[in-house]
């Protein structure tokens, strides 16, 4: 990253025998820095902060020395700051705040110049000449639409730095549409590494768009934008990719849902805080008159973690369906089978089949991924007193923990649910029975005889299915 402002600090001594020598050294150093920035070709600003020692006094010629240094180096007065001595803590904080405010204005102007330069280059409508000679075998030149995506992306990032989120969103949207157009992503073969690189860039731009909309508190628009990207990529992968009936696609779906959950966790959305007990946010005024679907509203993070868990279930199911021949490492498979396997699976941001679900070694821990998403979702629902969904997620967590034989955590989740279960009073006997059997297995393996007897007594009810003891 090239800095917008290069801030340097220098101290001046009050010793008259060393003042001239030190001032000359400071001027020489500042001049060298200034010349170096000019030769680099970048528009980085240079700002100087001079600190005077504690025994100095403004009446002792300190201001004259500072003016002499500034004029000798040709520094703009707006970029040259003096911190007087013997100031209180409050005064120093005020000086620091004023300095940062002035430097911030220079940084904004720096990024405004860069954005103007990027828009000017895009408006030329020609492919720029390469700055370095192409290397045989490794050169990947861009087409004109590719350069347009590059310039739009740069303009959007510079607008983000200036906190102009509306302008940034428009530039990101333009870059997104050009990238997913018929002249770029759709003509890249899905076996090429550039295909996954282009998909990654599309995801990055979509995430940036979400960030801009959430920054501007356009929450419904952000959810719609999330769904729009999901639908566009689904259509693209179905038409020119490897389809959506594979573990790789559901790995992406799970990750895309988690992106929105992470956004909600990190952003200070006060209207959706657990203390408000709100499940979702009402639409903003600009779209309040439209007929919105429930899934177009911004729900709390638990909703998105639960969605991520559902796709992780599908990922595991597709992974377990991988044929044994494809689960072998490439070194143990014929070359022809390795070549055919390379074009059969979507491995965008996920492991190869022999790493996803290997024959002999431990592959991806799907249970851990699912359990992590379920527990996060359960925590969010519990904060908002959505007890029925908390019970459902607790049972889902218990199923995963049962497969790993973590009986202590199964007990921790199911004992409160079994003692205060609304499904029992409402006649949901199949759910009640499922909870009972799973809790009985955990109690038996935890040596809780009292709990085993109590559960057995309930399972002997005539309304339950035929009792088959499962130890």
Protein language model regions, located:
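Extended alpha-helical scaffold regions
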Residues: 1-471
């Amino acid at each position: 990253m090239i800095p917008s402002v290069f801030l340097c600090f220098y101290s001046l001594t009050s010793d008259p025998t060393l003042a001239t020598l030190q001032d000359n050294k400071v001027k020489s150093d500042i001049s060298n820095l200034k010349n170096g920035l000019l030769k680099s070709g970048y528009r980085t600003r240079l700002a100087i902060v001079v600190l005077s020692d504690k025994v100095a006094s403004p009446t002792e010629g300190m201001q004259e020395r500072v003016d002499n240094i500034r004029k000798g180096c040709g520094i703009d007065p707006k970029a040259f700051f003096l911190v007087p001595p013997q100031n209180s803590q409050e005064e120093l904080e005020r000086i620091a705040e004023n300095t940062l405010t002035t430097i911030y204005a220079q940084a904004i102007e720096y990024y405004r110049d860069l954005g103007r330069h990027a828009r000017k280059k895009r408006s030329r409508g020609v492919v720029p000449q390469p700055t370095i000679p192409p290397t045989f075998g490794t050169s990947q030149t861009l087409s004109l639409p590719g350069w347009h995506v590059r310039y739009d992306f740069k303009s959007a990032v510079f607008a983000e730095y200036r906190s102009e989120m509306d302008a940034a969103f428009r530039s990101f949207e333009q870059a997104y549409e050009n990238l997913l157009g018929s002249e770029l992503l759709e003509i890249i073969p899905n076996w090429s590494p550039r295909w996954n690189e282009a998909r990654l860039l599309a995801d990055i731009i979509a995430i940036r768009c979400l960030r801009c909309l959430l920054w501007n508190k356009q929450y419904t628009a952000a959810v719609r934008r999330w769904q729009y990207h999901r639908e566009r990529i689904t259509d693209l992968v179905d038409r020119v990719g490897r389809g959506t009936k594979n573990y790789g696609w559901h790995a992406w779906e799970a990750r895309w849902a988690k992106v929105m959950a992470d956004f909600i966790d990190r952003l200070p959305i006060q209207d959706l805080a657990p203390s408000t007990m709100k499940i979702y946010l009402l639409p903003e005024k600009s779209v309040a008159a439209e007929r919105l679907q429930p899934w177009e509203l911004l729900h709390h993070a638990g909703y998105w973690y639960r969605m991520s868990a559902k796709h992780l279930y599908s990922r595991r199911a597709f992974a377990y369906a991988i044929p044994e021949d494809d689960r072998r490492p490439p070194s143990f498979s014929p070359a022809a089978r390795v070549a055919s396997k390379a074009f059969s699976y979507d491995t965008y941001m996920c492991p190869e089949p022999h790493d996803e679900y290997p024959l002999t070694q431990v592959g991806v821990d799907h249970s851990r991924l699912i359990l992590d998403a379920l527990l996060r979702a359960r925590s969010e629902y519990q904060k908002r007193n959505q007890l029925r969904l908390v019970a459902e997620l607790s049972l889902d967590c218990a199923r995963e923990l049962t497969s790993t034989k973590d009986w202590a955590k199964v007990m921790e989740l199911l004992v409160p649910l079994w003692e205060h279960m609304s499904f029992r009073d409402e006649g949901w006997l199949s759910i009640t029975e499922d909870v009972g059997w799973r809790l009985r297995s955990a109690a038996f393996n935890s040596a809780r005889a009292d709990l085993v007897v109590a559960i057995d007594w309930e399972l002997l009810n005539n309304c339950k299915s035929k009792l088959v003891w499962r130890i």
